[in-house]
C-alpha cells in the first residue's frame, strides 16, 4: 500500500513512549463489564497483535493505539460509560467533508462509525440497548480515524517514496497525539483539524477551485470538440459554436451570450488566448492540435489533476519561510517569493525527460561569477567524447581543457597526446573543464545551494531557448533567464555589489565566489495545477509523467482485514 502509515507510527511511538508520570501500572484483570475493560482486553488478550480488526475494519495504527490507551488507563476517549460525547458528531461531519480536501471519508472508517452510532442511538424495535462493546469499538475506530486523517492532512495520504515521485522536500513532523488530546480536552475537533490542514494559500485556492470544477462536472461538464482542423479568426460554423460553448463552461469566455455565436470573432479569439495562457500554450489565438488537445481534456481529469496537486501541497512543511525562491518544473519558471507573493519571475529551462530535475529544497549560500564548468563524467563520456572523435578541434572551439588526477593532484593534459580512439561511453579516465567566457555552458553566473543531486541554477549562452513554450533541454540543472537581476536581488544587502560592480566582474574572465549575505531557501517543486495570485486557474502538461502514479495511489482503497 502507498499509505504513509509507517511514518505516522514512528511519530506516535516517539510521542507516546514516555507514558504518564506518577500513575501506577494496571495489574488487575479486565472484567469486560465496561468499554474501558473491553478496550484493555482487546489489547492484552494476546499482546500487541500485528492486526487489530474492529467492526470489520482494520485498525491501521495497531502498533500505536495500545500505547495511546495505556497512557489514559484505557478510558474511552470519545464516550462516557453509556454514550458518545458530543465531539463525535463534529468529527463525523468533518469526515463527511473530507472530499473538500481531495480525500475520502471512507478511508477513515466513516461508514462503520456511522453504523455504530446508529445502533447506539436508534436500536431496532425489540432489541436491547447495545452493550459496552459497541462503545469500545466506536472509540477505537474514532481514535484510529483521527490519527490517520490528521496525518494525511499534515503529511499527505501517499508516501512519495512508494511511487517514486522524485520528491525529496523535507516534510514536517507533528505530535498527532497532542493534537488529539487538544481536540478532546477543548471539545473542538474542528479547530484541531484546521490546525492539521495545510495553511498554504496555494492549497486553499486549489480547494476552492476543486469545488468549482466538481460543480461543472455535476452539471454535465463540457463537450468534446470534434474534428481535427484548426480553427482561427473569421471561421464560422457549428464547430465554432461548440468552441464558444466549451470556453463558456470553463470560464474563459466573458459573456454567456453572443449575437454571432458561430463566428470566430475578436471576442472569441481573446477567449482562446486566455485559455492558451492558463494552459502554458503559445498564445496565438488559433485552435491548433495542442490547444484542441487541451480543450478536450474532460473536467473529471482536471479534477484529478487538482487533487494530485493538493496532495503535493500536503507533502510540504507548513511554512516555506517569508522569503524564498520557487521553481515550478512543469511551468518552466522561477519565482522570487516574499510573503507568498511574487516579487520577481523569470523563465527557466529544466531537465530533459530522461534527465529529469528532481523536486527538493536546499539553502542557497553563494553564487559564482564567471564560473568554470567542470563537465560531469557521464556527460564527458557519453556526449563529448563522440564529438571530440568527430572533430579534433572541438575542445579548442569550446574552450575545454583536459585534466588527469583528482583534487590537488589534478594536472592539465595535452589532448593531442591522448589516444581518443580508445575511449568509449563507458571508459574515459580524464576530466574536462570548460573555461569561463561567452561559450561556457553555465553562462555568466551560477547560484549554489549544495545538495546531493548536484543541481543548481545558472545562466546560459543560449538565450533563444527561453522563447520556446516547452523548455526541457538541460541535464537536470536549471537555467534561468535573468541571472544578473537575480544576483542583484540576492546581494542587495551587500553594498559592495551593485549592478555596475557585477557587470565589471563579468568583464574579467576569472571565476569569483560571492557569499550571499542573507542565505535563502530554494524550493524546486512540480505543480501541474495551481491558482495564480489573481485567481486564474492554471494547468500544465505532466512533462515527467508524475501525475498518473500519484492519482492512481490516491484512488487505492485502504487496507482491508
Task: Name each model feature, range by range.
Residues 6-19:
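Bacterial N-terminal signal peptides
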Residues 29-172:
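Cationic-aromatic interfacial patches
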Residues 26-70, 140, 144-147, 167-174, ...:
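Well-ordered beta-sheet/strand-loop patches within structured domains
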Residues 1-4:
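N-terminal secretory signal peptides that target proteins for export/translocation
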Amino acid at each position: 500500500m502507498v499509505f504513509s502509515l509507517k511514518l505516522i507510527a514512528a511519530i506516535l511511538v516517539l510521542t507516546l513512549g514516555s507514558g504518564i508520570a506518577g500513575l501506577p501500572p494496571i495489574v488487575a484483570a479486565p472484567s469486560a463489564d465496561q468499554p474501558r475493560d473491553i478496550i484493555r482486553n482487546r489489547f492484552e488478550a494476546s499482546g500487541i497483535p500485528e492486526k487489530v480488526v474492529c467492526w470489520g475494519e482494520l485498525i491501521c495504527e495497531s502498533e500505536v493505539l495500545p500505547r495511546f490507551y495505556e497512557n489514559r488507563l484505557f478510558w474511552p476517549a470519545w464516550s462516557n460509560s453509556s454514550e458518545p460525547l458530543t465531539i463525535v458528531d463534529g468529527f463525523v461531519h468533518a469526515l463527511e467533508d473530507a472530499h473538500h480536501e481531495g480525500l475520502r471519508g471512507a478511508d477513515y472508517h466513516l461508514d462503520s462509525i456511522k453504523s455504530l452510532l446508529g445502533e447506539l442511538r436508534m436500536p431496532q424495535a425489540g432489541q436491547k440497548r447495545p452493550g459496552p462493546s459497541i462503545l469500545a469499538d466506536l472509540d477505537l475506530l474514532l481514535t484510529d480515524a483521527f490519527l490517520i486523517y490528521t496525518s494525511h492532512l499534515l503529511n499527505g495520504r501517499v508516501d512519495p517514496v512508494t511511487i517514486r515521485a522524485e520528491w525529496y522536500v523535507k516534510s514536517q513532523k507533528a505530535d498527532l497525539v497532542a493534537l488529539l488530546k487538544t481536540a478532546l480536552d477543548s471539545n473542538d475537533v474542528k479547530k484541531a483539524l484546521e490546525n492539521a490542514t495545510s495553511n498554504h494559500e496555494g492549497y486553499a485556492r486549489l480547494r476552492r477551485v476543486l469545488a468549482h470544477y466538481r460543480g461543472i462536472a455535476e452539471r454535465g461538464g463540457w463537450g468534446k470538440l470534434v474534428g481535427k482542423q484548426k480553427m482561427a479568426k473569421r471561421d464560422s460554423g457549428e464547430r465554432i459554436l461548440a468552441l464558444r460553448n466549451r470556453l463558456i463552461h470553463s470560464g474563459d469566455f466573458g459573456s454567456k451570450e453572443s449575437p454571432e455565436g458561430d463566428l470566430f470573432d475578436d471576442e472569441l479569439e481573446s477567449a482562446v488566448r486566455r485559455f492558451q495562457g492558463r494552459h502554458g500554450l503559445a498564445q496565438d489565438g488559433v485552435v491548433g492540435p495542442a490547444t484542441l488537445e487541451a480543450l478536450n481534456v474532460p473536467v473529471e481529469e482536471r479534477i484529478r489533476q487538482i487533487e494530485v496537486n493538493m496532495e503535493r501541497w500536503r507533502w510540504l512543511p507548513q511554512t516555506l519561510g517569508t522569503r524564498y525562491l520557487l521553481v515550478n518544473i512543469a511551468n518552466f519558471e522561477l519565482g522570487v517569493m516574499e510573503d507568498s507573493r511574487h516579487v520577481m519571475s523569470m523563465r527557466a529551462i529544466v531537465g530533459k525527460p530522461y534527465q529529469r530535475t528532481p523536486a527538493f529544497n536546499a539553502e542557497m549560500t553563494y553564487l559564482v561569477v564567471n564560473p568554470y564548468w567542470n563537465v560531469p563524467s557521464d556527460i564527458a563520456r557519453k556526449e563529448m567524447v563522440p564529438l571530440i572523435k568527430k572533430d579534433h578541434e572541438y575542445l579548442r572551439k569550446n574552450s575545454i581543457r583536459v585534466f588527469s588526477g583528482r583534487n590537488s593532484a589534478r594536472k592539465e593534459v595535452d589532448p593531442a597526446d591522448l589516444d581518443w580512439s580508445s575511449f568509449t561511453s563507458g571508459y574515459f579516465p580524464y576530466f574536462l573543464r570548460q573555461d569561463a567566457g561567452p561559450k561556457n555552458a553555465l553562462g555568466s553566473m551560477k547560484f549554489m545551494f549544495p545538495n546531493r543531486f548536484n543541481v543548481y541554477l545558472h545562466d546560459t549562452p543560449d538565450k533563444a531557448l527561453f522563447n520556446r513554450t516547452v523548455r526541457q533541454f538541460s541535464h537536470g540543472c536549471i537555467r534561468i533567464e535573468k541571472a544578473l537581476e537575480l544576483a542583484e536581488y540576492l546581494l542587495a544587502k551587500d553594498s559592495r555589489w551593485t549592478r555596475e560592480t557585477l557587470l565589471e566582474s563579468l568583464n574579467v574572465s576569472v571565476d569569483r565566489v560571492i557569499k550571499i549575505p542573507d542565505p535563502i531557501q530554494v524550493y524546486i517543486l512540480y505543480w501541474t495545477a495551481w491558482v495564480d495570485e489573481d485567481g486564474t486557474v492554471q494547468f500544465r502538461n505532466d512533462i515527467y509523467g508524475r501525475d498518473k502514479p500519484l492519482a492512481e495511489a490516491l484512488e487505492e482503497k485502504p487496507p482491508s482485514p
